[in-house]
């Protein structure tokens, strides 16, 4: 069966590193690298299959790396050559991380980061479509934040899209962002309440962790300061199907000998 075969027997992968402008309005200025991986089924190489480019969620996550013949990539490669793009700033596409930005002045950094939004992500895709794969149209799959990229693509370059699949992340068309945030706040409160109802010990552990952070200078493995706000960002896990259990088990392992454990700090950093 395909599951028992090596990935090389199932897929052909072709990697591209492409130089694109940081700012498309000034293409002669600074360039950045964009990494994209073409994944095709070996059995379909003789077919002229269309292209499907995948926009990952996050924002900030790299494109998936196929490690098994399963999931949506298995299904998509039956009908498409799948293009897995590391959106600018992620993965192998001029990644934004502490190492890459540590020498940038604050004002320059703020301007630099402004070029890593959905509008330029789709311009990268257009550059690749036209200059690397030379096709007039292709299809798009957007997951979570990738759905915002897909909608952006539909707004600016609809003539080059065949089909658009969105599995989450649809921006409001006529509502103000504040309305979305107000609705989100209510959802967050409900999620927190439910979390502590299911795992009452987690509430005690969370307070213990918060008190420790408030009273001590805590640093993460990369040197960043662990603030209360950074700790609160773990609530992002409540949006995942198994997130409540994940958080509860993480809080259980937060302390060793009265100090925040290395395991806990590494998980916060992840």
Q: Model features per residue range: what roles?
A:
Residues 1-11:
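Single conserved hydrophobic/aromatic residue that forms the stacking wall/gate
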């Amino acid at each position: 069966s395909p599951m028992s075969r090596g990935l090389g027997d199932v897929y052909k992968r072709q990697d591209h590193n492409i130089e694109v402008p940081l700012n498309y309005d000034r293409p002669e200025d600074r360039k950045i690298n964009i990494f994209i991986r073409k994944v095709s089924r070996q059995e379909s190489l003789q077919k002229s299959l269309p292209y499907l480019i995948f926009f990952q969620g996050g924002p900030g996550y790299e494109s998936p790396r196929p490690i098994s013949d399963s999931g949506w990539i298995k299904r998509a490669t039956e009908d498409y050559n799948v293009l897995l793009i590391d959106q600018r700033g992620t993965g192998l596409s001029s990644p934004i991380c502490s190492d890459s930005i540590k020498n940038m002045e604050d004002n320059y950094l703020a301007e630099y980061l402004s070029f890593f939004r959905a509008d330029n992500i789709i311009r990268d895709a257009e550059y690749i479509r036209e200059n690397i794969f030379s096709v007039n149209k292709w299809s798009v799959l957007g997951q979570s934040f990738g759905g915002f990229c897909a909608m952006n693509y539909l707004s600016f370059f609809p003539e080059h899209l065949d089909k658009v699949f969105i599995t989450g992340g649809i921006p409001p068309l006529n509502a103000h962002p504040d309305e979305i945030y107000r609705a989100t706040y209510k959802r967050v409160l409900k999620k927190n309440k439910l979390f502590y109802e299911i795992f009452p010990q987690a509430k005690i552990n969370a307070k213990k962790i918060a008190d420790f952070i408030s009273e001590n200078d805590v640093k993460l493995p990369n040197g960043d300061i662990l603030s209360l706000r950074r700790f609160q960002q773990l609530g992002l896990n409540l949006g995942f199907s198994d997130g409540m259990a994940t958080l509860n088990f993480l809080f259980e392992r937060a302390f060793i000998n009265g100090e925040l454990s290395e395991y806990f700090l590494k998980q916060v950093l992840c």
